[in-house]
């Protein structure tokens, strides 16, 4: 859904630029960023059964629950799964050693200026949403966030793949939940964010 809307918006933007150029050929310019990668192994990936891109919906957390918890407590963690299967090399050779599979969190909407325990916190993308509360990834649901994931950090904890859950592949289970370093300053509203990942075979 988001990709379709973005494509429609881009088409509109380019159409508007073409119309302007008909009247004035010197109207400025800009930069378009493209991202890609060449790999020697490809796999089928499904997050919560939705494909490689997905939405994960958390249960709401109340202000009472937030303010009753200590700072940086993991609140209402929600589990989600990443299934990886049918890996093949560039020449079509099946790559079926699931012990080589892994998930690496590469980035996201990280909280700007984060220090200490806030490292890895994913900032709210909704400017008019809840304030002073973030989302956090982890490999478990422990309230102490002992296995917090910092996207982009090479030392991030890794979820173990469950080969019994996916044919010719493995299932990786992760959690996402709320956290805040300042519980008393949190306000009500929507909390949305995102993180990016890549599948590794090594």
UniProtKB/Swiss-Prot annotation:
The keyword Metal-binding does not apply. Disulfide bonds join 43-87. Its main location: other. GO terms for cellular component: pilus. InterPro entries: Adhesion_dom_fimbrial (IPR000259), Adhesion_dom_fimbrial_sf (IPR036937), Adhesion_dom_sf (IPR008966), Bact_Fimbrial_Adh_Pro (IPR050263). One of its GO terms (biological process) is cell adhesion involved in single-species biofilm formation. Belongs to the fimbrial protein family. This is Fimbrial subunit type 3. It comes from Klebsiella pneumoniae.
């Amino acid at each position: 859904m988001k990709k379709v809307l973005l494509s429609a918006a881009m088409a509109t933007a380019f159409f508007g630029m073409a119309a302007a150029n008909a009247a004035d050929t010197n109207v400025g310019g800009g930069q378009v960023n493209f991202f890609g990668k060449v790999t020697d192994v490809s796999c089928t990936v499904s997050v919560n059964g939705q494909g490689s891109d997905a939405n994960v919906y958390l249960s709401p957390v109340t202000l009472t629950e937030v303010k009753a918890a200590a700072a940086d407590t993991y609140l209402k963690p929600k589990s989600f799964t990443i299934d990886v299967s049918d890996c093949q090399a560039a020449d079509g050779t099946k790559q079926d050693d699931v012990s080589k599979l892994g998930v690496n969190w590469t980035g996201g909407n990280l909280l700007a200026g984060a220090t200490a325990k806030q490292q890895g916190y994913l900032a709210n993308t909704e400017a008019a949403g809840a304030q002073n509360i973030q989302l956090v990834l982890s490999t478990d649901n422990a309230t102490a966030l002992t296995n917090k994931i910092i996207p982009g950090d090479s030392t991030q904890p890794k979820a173990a793949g469950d080969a019994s859950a996916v044919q010719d592949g493995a299932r990786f289970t992760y959690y996402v939940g709320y956290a805040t370093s300042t519980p008393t300053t949190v306000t009500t509203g929507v909390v949305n964010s995102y993180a990016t990942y890549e599948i590794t075979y090594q």
